[in-house]
């Protein structure tokens, strides 16, 4: 026998039946099982809800990403619209000059027309369209800034356009500012 306790072999302990946990009685066994099944069902439901929330969030983020890419030109288009307005005003002013038109004025007007035409083509190529302003007033596309009596128009019809409106795909970038006819 070895006197060194570090090298000593572990001795087997005898385990009596009294130290073993007692088996549950048959009545409480059924309730414990039902309790565990209820807990499993609760955890499964919780898992399904969390998984559904995750999938919905994933789909929403994918949709938002697609829309962000789809409408990427919207901000720059809004910034370009005042430039188009300024070119149109300059062309209108050049056309209203009275008197004899010099060759320089004619070339200037031609340059403005070409610039405005190119601008319009670029906007159209990128899906930016001018809002039509004929006929009936549409509050989704037009902004009424005044009502005027007009014997040649029916009530609610657009009489005059003060500023053109534009849309990018389905979204209105800027509503058209118009006056509409009112009844006398």
From Swiss-Prot:
- Residue intervals passing through the bilayer: none
Q: Does the keyword Chaperone apply?
A: yes
Q: Which InterPro entries match?
A: GrpE, GrpE_coiled_coil, GrpE_head
Source taxon at top rank: Bacteria
Its main subcellular localisation, reduced to a broad class, is cytoplasm
Among the entry's GO cellular component annotations, what is one? Answer: cytosol
Compartments where located: Cytoplasm
Q: What does this protein do?
A: Participates actively in the response to hyperosmotic and heat shock by preventing the aggregation of stress-denatured proteins, in association with DnaK and GrpE. It is the nucleotide exchange factor for DnaK and may function as a thermosensor. Unfolded proteins bind initially to DnaJ; upon interaction with the DnaJ-bound protein, DnaK hydrolyzes its bound ATP, resulting in the formation of a stable complex. GrpE releases ADP from DnaK; ATP binding to DnaK triggers the release of the substrate protein, thus completing the reaction cycle.
Q: How does it assemble?
A: Homodimer.
Q: Which family does it belong to?
A: Belongs to the GrpE family.
Can you name this protein?
A: Protein GrpE
């Amino acid at each position: 026998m070895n006197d060194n306790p570090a090298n000593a072999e572990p001795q087997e302990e005898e385990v009596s039946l009294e130290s073993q946990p007692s088996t549950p009685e048959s009545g409480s066994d059924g309730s414990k099982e039902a309790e565990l099944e209820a807990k499993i069902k609760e955890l499964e439901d919780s898992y399904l809800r969390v998984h559904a929330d995750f999938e919905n969030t994933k789909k929403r983020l994918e949709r938002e990403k697609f829309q962000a890419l789809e409408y990427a030109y919207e901000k720059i288009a809004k910034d370009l619209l005042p430039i188009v307005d300024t070119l149109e005003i300059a062309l209108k002013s050049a056309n209203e000059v009275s008197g004899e038109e010099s060759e320089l004025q004619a070339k200037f007007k031609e340059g403005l027309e070409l610039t405005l035409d190119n601008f319009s083509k670029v906007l159209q190529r990128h899906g930016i369209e001018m809002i039509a302003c004929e006929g009936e007033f549409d509050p989704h596309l037009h902004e009424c800034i005044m009502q005027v009596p007009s014997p040649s128009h029916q009530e609610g019809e657009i009489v005059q356009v003060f500023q053109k409106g534009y849309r990018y795909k389905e979204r209105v970038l800027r509503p058209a500012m118009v006056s509409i006819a009112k009844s006398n």
